[in-house]
């Protein structure tokens, strides 16, 4: 859809570009673009890449001076996510090994998966994109997983805001991996009122509070019994209840969160008071003024007594800065005020600067008139056409309105409307209890959370039919009401019932070519990536009636978007990227529709080429 819309923009700016020097129009129209769709399983490019990697030529090069190295290539024809294959391989062949194991991955989720691996000497190598960009050279982080787990457990057991504890290292790490995945994953929508990236400290605090509340019962969120991981309903209920104040604050001050980018962090930094729209600017400015005073005193060897005894300011400062010493961020929460100031002095002597605070009064940007976007446009010397493309990609100016990219209004009087709009239900009955249909929504989301838990902790299979059928997540308040109304047996039955979604016979599931067709709009750029027999069938007059209704008409959708000043077709509320927006005319296929799709597409008579590109087997680990 995005590329089709950009074609319209190019046509609109054709005359302008023709008037520019250096054949700008021709260079734009005929620019060399490499479609990312080519790296999708089922394409000719991926088939060639697999054959190339497995060729004698490459295998010989890989083994040069590495005769003892066992190189395993698992490709797209072996189903499964790459990280899942790594985890399963380690579990099967390296379980409790005394050897050192290192995993290389750009995916942050793999850090969590590494924390669950049964290996003592485990490291993860990760390319640090942000630092590499800053220093204009490749910089890698080497993460010692055992040290990471010990540091996390030390933080939990020695948190200065709570009593000193002795919770078990493995249990703490199981729990935090679980918490991290439940509140931030690619399988179910995030809960709108809980921002994992900008408010993870609140989640950590709620977890630690729950851990201490249930200490006498020796209860953790995750338990390992007879080699299988189980999720505690009791703990889950309690940790969600401990997060409800955060949700209530988000709802009460919804306008504030929808205005300031770091509102969640600001709330945490100044947790001793209630931050609202009226005081946020003055509180922040006063804090920054005091930080400026502290920096000047350190620079000039002034009297620091005021700051050494000012717990309120220093606690806020500790929460808002990261002091890097020896390439490590020092956790200042355990330090006294005097030691923190001493560390700041040492940092200044070493770098001649002070750490920046991680909070600011930046607002969510919706216009090219905002300073950040003005600077980008000026630095890149964009012409009018490029500015239009930039506005489109970032959903700025008229696109902000056209695509309904405003913040989602979750103020108190808009909650029921939220459920009506995104779930099509009435939330509460006359007694303020969840309606039957609302309970179904909560059940679906609970099943989703359990599926995510099972995926990370237990499930070693590769093919699964489960999916979350809604576009949004319910709010914690109503999820909590639902969990209070179910018993442990029902909860455990939901977890054990997930096995029914596992695909036992891979022949009954999508092969690479079928999956490419299933997830892609049948536009010319995609169709030409298919084997010739599929191309002929899809463009013929004999296309199966089901497929005629299944394939979306991208041009029709783009026509509507182009013509309407405010689209009734697309919903981008609180969605940062255009490709994640909700297209209302596109519904998620049901499992029965999946079967109809496979029946229809398998009418295509296979050829030698399509057969090669349609192979599908399971790894042996």
Swiss-Prot record:
Recorded source organism is: Acanthamoeba polyphaga mimivirus
The Gene Ontology CC terms held by the record are:
virion component
Matching InterPro entries, A to Z? 5_3_exoribonuclease, Xrn1_helical, Xrn1_N
Annotated GO molecular function terms are: 5'-3' RNA exonuclease activity; RNA binding
A GO BP entry? nuclear-transcribed mRNA catabolic process
At the top of the EC hierarchy, this enzyme's class is hydrolase
Coiled-coil ranges (or none): none
Q: What is its main location?
A: virion
Subcellular location(s) per record: Virion
Q: Which family does it belong to?
A: Belongs to the 5'-3' exonuclease family.
Q: What is its EC number?
A: 3.1.11.-
At the highest ranks, the source species' classification is:
Viruses, Varidnaviria, Bamfordvirae, Nucleocytoviricota, Megaviricetes
Provide the alphabetized UniProt keywords.
Answer: Exonuclease, Hydrolase, Nuclease, Virion
Q: State the protein's name.
A: Putative 5'-3' exonuclease R528
Which cysteines are disulphide-bonded?
none
One Pfam family name from the record? XRN_N
């Amino acid at each position: 859809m995005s590329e089709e819309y950009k074609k319209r923009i190019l046509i609109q700016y054709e005359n302008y570009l023709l008037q520019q020097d250096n054949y700008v129009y021709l260079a734009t129209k005929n620019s060399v673009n490499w479609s990312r769709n080519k790296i999708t399983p089922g394409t000719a490019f991926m088939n060639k890449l697999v054959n190339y990697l497995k060729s004698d030529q490459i295998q010989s090069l890989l083994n040069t001076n590495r005769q003892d190295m066992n190189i395993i290539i698992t490709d797209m024809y072996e189903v499964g996510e790459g990280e899942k294959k790594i985890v399963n391989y380690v579990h099967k062949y390296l379980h409790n090994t005394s050897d050192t194991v290192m995993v290389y991955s750009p995916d942050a989720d793999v850090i969590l998966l590494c924390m669950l691996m049964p290996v003592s000497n485990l490291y993860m190598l990760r390319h640090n994109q942000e630092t590499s960009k800053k220093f204009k050279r490749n910089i890698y982080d080497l993460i010692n997983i055992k040290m990471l787990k010990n540091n996390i457990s030390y933080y939990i057991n020695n948190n200065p805001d709570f009593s000193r504890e002795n919770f078990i290292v493995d249990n703490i790490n199981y729990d935090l991996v679980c918490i991290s995945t439940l509140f931030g994953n690619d399988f179910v929508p995030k809960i709108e009122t809980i921002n994992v990236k900008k408010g993870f400290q609140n989640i950590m605090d709620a977890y630690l509070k729950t851990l201490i509340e249930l200490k006498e019962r020796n209860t953790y969120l995750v338990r390992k019994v007879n080699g299988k991981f189980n999720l505690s309903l009791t703990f889950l209920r309690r940790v969600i209840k401990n997060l409800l104040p955060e949700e209530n604050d988000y709802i009460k001050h919804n306008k504030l969160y929808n205005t300031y980018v770091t509102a969640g962090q600001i709330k945490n930094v100044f947790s001793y008071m209630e931050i609202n729209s009226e005081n946020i600017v003055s509180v922040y400015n006063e804090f920054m003024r005091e930080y400026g005073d502290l920096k000047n005193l350190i620079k000039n060897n002034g009297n620091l007594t005021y700051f050494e005894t000012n717990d309120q300011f220093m606690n806020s400062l500790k929460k808002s800065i990261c002091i890097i010493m020896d390439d490590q961020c020092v956790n200042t929460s355990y330090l006294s005020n005097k030691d923190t100031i001493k560390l700041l002095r040492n940092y200044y002597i070493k770098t001649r600067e002070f750490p920046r605070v991680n909070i600011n009064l930046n607002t969510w940007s919706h216009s090219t008139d905002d300073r950040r976007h003005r600077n980008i446009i000026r630095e890149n010397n964009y012409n009018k056409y490029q500015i239009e493309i930039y506005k489109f990609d970032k959903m700025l100016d008229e696109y902000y309105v056209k695509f309904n990219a405003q913040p989602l209004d979750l103020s108190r009087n808009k909650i029921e409307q939220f459920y009506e709009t995104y779930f099509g239900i009435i939330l509460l009955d006359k007694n303020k209890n969840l309606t039957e249909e609302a309970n179904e929504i909560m059940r679906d989301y609970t099943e989703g959370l359990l599926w995510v838990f099972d995926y990370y902790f237990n499930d070693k299979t590769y093919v699964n039919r489960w999916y979350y059928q809604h576009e949004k997540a319910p709010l914690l308040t109503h999820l909590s009401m639902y969990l209070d109304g179910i018993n442990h047996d029902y909860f455990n039955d939901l977890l054990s019932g997930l096995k029914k979604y596992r695909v036992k016979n891979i022949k009954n599931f999508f092969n690479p070519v079928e999956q490419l067709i299933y997830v892609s709009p049948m536009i010319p750029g995609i169709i030409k990536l298919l084997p010739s027999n599929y191309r002929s069938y899809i463009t013929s007059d004999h296309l199966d009636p089901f497929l005629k209704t299944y394939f979306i008409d991208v041009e029709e959708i783009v026509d509507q978007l182009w013509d309407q000043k405010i689209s009734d077709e697309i919903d981008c509320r609180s969605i940062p990227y255009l490709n994640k927006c909700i297209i209302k005319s596109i519904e998620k296929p049901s499992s029965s529709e999946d079967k109809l799709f496979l029946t229809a597409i398998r009418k295509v008579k296979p050829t030698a080429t399509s057969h090669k590109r349609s192979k599908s087997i399971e790894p042996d680990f």
